[in-house]
Amino acid sequence: VIRSLVVNNNSEEALENIGLKITFEPEFAKEFTYHIGSIPAKSSAEISPVRISTNTDLLFSLTEKMVGNITIEVLQNGENIFTYQNTIELLACDQWSGLNIMPEMIAAFVTPNHPALSPVIHDASTFLKKWKGDPSFTGYQTNNPNNVKLQMAAIFAALVQQKIVYNDPPASYEIIGQRIRLPHKVLKQKMGTCLDLAVLYAACLEAVGLHPLLFFMTGHAICGCWLENETFADCCVDD
């Protein structure tokens, strides 16, 4: 929530017995207090990291985006000498914030260990057995890009069997974000946006030891995969 804080003393005298208090409205995190002590004249004190303990029950209960408030107070001898307030957006647990703010957070919705994927992977293995006589997913062990393509195709074929219906995402979703259906919802509801389906496919690929990629363009998202045992150095790359 807060990485670090710097308290500046711009006066000509040292400030003694200085403390910090951070409160949250609604209480999506516990009140944070910190004793700084003395700040010399024309100096500053940095608090890093700021160890905020979040209220997971409240955050998981959110069903829509809401705006919260953060209040930071600087105290001297327990009395307020400075107050700073700002707002923060709180998202429901299935909301992605879009490309404008930490786009790499989309990776949190790729869930290769989700139990709903097991039947899909099992169905995909039957396609592998039919095509090459071996149902095993070997990831990159063979160092053969064509084998990786076969594994990708098998998972894709298994997902096609699910008869999932495509539905349009919200306008400008890639910028402002959207609600994302996790695998169990897509497979149960039999529908999903391009991002829902891309995230589902990526989860299946990662579940069998492959390295998926998510590509975003105006109004659309697609999933790809490395054909070699490689990854980008950075989690988010602009083209």
Across the structure, where does each feature detected by a protein language model lie?
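Short, solvent-exposed loop/turn segments enriched in Ser/Thr/Gly
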Residues: 1-4, 65-69
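Contiguous beta-strand segments within globular domains
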Residues: 1-4, 48-50, 136-137
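Asparagine-centered strand-capping/turn motif at beta-strand->loop junctions
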Residues: 5-12
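Short, hydrophobic/aromatic beta-strand segments
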Residues: 12-21
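Intrinsically disordered, low-complexity Pro/Gly/Ser/Thr-rich segments with frequent PxxP/GP/PP motifs
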Residues: 22-65, 77-80
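Short beta-strand elements
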Residues: 79-112
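Secondary-structure boundary elements
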Residues: 113-189
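Hydrophobic/aromatic-rich core segments of domains that either
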Residues: 192-239
